Structure formats: C-alpha cells, structure tokens
C-alpha cells in the first residue's frame, strides 16, 4: 500500500500595508495575532508554539519572542504599520509592546488597552491563600 503524502496548504502572499497586533497576555501564556484592519488574520504566534514549556511560557522573554515571530511572519505579507491592542494582566504585556516598536521596518500607529473590566458583573473567584 502506498504511503500518503501530507498535504500542506500553500501560504498565499497577501499585500497588506497596515495591520493590528492583538497581544493577549495571560498569567500562563502570551498569544500574538496580527490581523488586517477588517479583522482577517495574517499571522499568529504564541510562547507555547515557539517551544517554551510550563512556567517559561509566562516570562517576558517568551512574550518578546512570540511578538518577533508573529511580526516576521506578517512582514512577509507586506505589513509596515501596526496598531497594538493589549489584553490581559500577564507579565509579558510591557515587553511585548516594546518589542513591536523595536522591530526595524515597523511603524506603530496606536496603542490601546482592551482588557475587559466588569462594571460589577459576575462574582469574582475566591482569593488564593498561598
């Protein structure tokens, strides 16, 4: 019986000049998604997908590496301007936003914190006693 070859999708190069970098920094991981202005995904990366495991995923260095990887993938599609939307309380927030600004060939147009805050909604989980 013949072996089947793994079918891989061919990456179609898009020509997008502006995008939005969505950084979701949780306590356990940092997710970076780059979309166009309509919200269609161009590239993504995360600390876990780059090989960081366990508690190393939540470090600022892992967040910086995830941002650099996602922006490098987006630059293939012609992205030159990025807006930044940050969500979550994670330790990689500040490092990730600085990493976007430090990449050569990328101009940051805006920065916005889009962390959802309840106006006294659901009851919060009980505090941990460590």
Curated annotation (Swiss-Prot):
GO terms for molecular function: rRNA binding; structural constituent of ribosome. The keyword Plastid does not apply. Signal peptide: none annotated. Pfam families: Ribosomal_S11. GO terms for biological process: translation. InterPro entries: Ribosomal_uS11 (IPR001971), Ribosomal_uS11_bac-type (IPR019981), Ribosomal_uS11_sf (IPR036967). GO terms for cellular component: ribonucleoprotein complex; ribosome. Keywords: Ribonucleoprotein, Ribosomal protein, RNA-binding, rRNA-binding. It comes from the Bacteria. Located on the platform of the 30S subunit, it bridges several disparate RNA helices of the 16S rRNA. Forms part of the Shine-Dalgarno cleft in the 70S ribosome. Part of the 30S ribosomal subunit. Interacts with proteins S7 and S18. Binds to IF-3. Belongs to the universal ribosomal protein uS11 family. This is Small ribosomal subunit protein uS11. It comes from Sulfurimonas denitrificans (strain ATCC 33889 / DSM 1251) (Thiomicrospira denitrificans (strain ATCC 33889 / DSM 1251)).
